[in-house]
Amino acid sequence: MATTMKGLLKGLRYITQIFDEEKEQEMQIGFPTDVKHVAHIGSDGPTNTTPSWMNDFKTQEHEKGQVVSRGNSNKYNPQGTNQRGAGLKELLPSNTNEKPKQKTRRKPGGAASPNHNGSPPRKSSGNAASSDEPSKHSRHNRSAHGSTDSSNDQEPSVRRRRGGIPAPDTEVPNQIPDGSAPPRKATSRPRKLKGSSAGGEGSIKKSSKGKPENSVDTTCNDII
């Protein structure tokens, strides 16, 4: 019984596989060769009509081919390049009124060249140098006077420093603002402290008093 059941199951499986394959074939619509992809357009020949959106691409390709052919022909026909240059000149605006700028170089020792408008020439470099000389002399004189004035102003201060003369008291109040007392004069003498002087005197007195006692003791010892 088991073997018969296995044989029946195998037969059913085979039958089901056949039906499944038939169902898959029924779902297909037409053959793959009937479908035309974009890559297959134009393979049948120029007789078949192409879609409208392909016409634009063909016209652009045709124009590119003409441009390439023109560029290659210009190598052998230099007249073609001249014609193209003439066409570009016609498109550009004509600037006939503009004049080329002339670069003028100044001469090192001579006078400057006159202007194009007919104006008189400029002064020579020698005149300019002569006009600069008095200004330099005046500056030199001013600097000399300024140096002498500064030396005169500095002389009393230098003398005071060298001689050790103190500055007058009249200069101090001018620098002190109103309402403040003038500072006291600084004395160069050293001040003696009271404590130190008193201590010194006390030590001297003690030493003077102690001397006779020591001398008396020494004399007593000698006698004994």
From Swiss-Prot:
Expressed in columella cells from the root tip and epidermal cells at the base of lateral roots, leaves, stems, flowers, anthers, pollen and siliques. Residues 38-224 are annotated as: Disordered. Signal peptide: none annotated. It comes from the Eukaryota. Keywords: Cytoplasm, Cytoskeleton, Developmental protein, Growth regulation. GO terms for biological process: cell morphogenesis; cellulose microfibril organization; cytoplasmic microtubule organization; pollen tube growth. Disruption phenotype: Reduced primary root elongation. The keyword Zinc does not apply. It is found in: Cytoplasm, Cytoskeleton; Cytoplasm. Residues 29-42 form the CRIB domain. Pfam families: PBD. SMART domains: PBD. One of its GO terms (cellular component) is apical plasma membrane. Residues 69-84, 114-132, 144-155, 215-224 have a biased composition (Polar residues). InterPro entries: CRIB_dom (IPR000095). Induction: By auxin and abscisic acid (ABA) in roots. Functions as a downstream effector of Rho-related GTP binding proteins of the 'Rho of Plants' (ROPs) family. Participates in the propagation of ROP GTPase signals in specific cellular responses. Required for cortical microtubule organization. Promotes microtubule bundling and formation of well-ordered microtubule arrays in the neck region of pavement cells. This restricts cell lateral expansion to generate the narrow neck morphology of pavement cells. Its function is inhibited when it interacts with activated ARAC4/ROP2. Over-expression of RIC1 in tobacco germinating pollen reduces pollen tube elongation. Interacts with ARAC11/ROP1. PANTHER family: CRIB DOMAIN-CONTAINING PROTEIN RIC1, CRIB DOMAIN-CONTAINING PROTEIN RIC8. This is CRIB domain-containing protein RIC1.
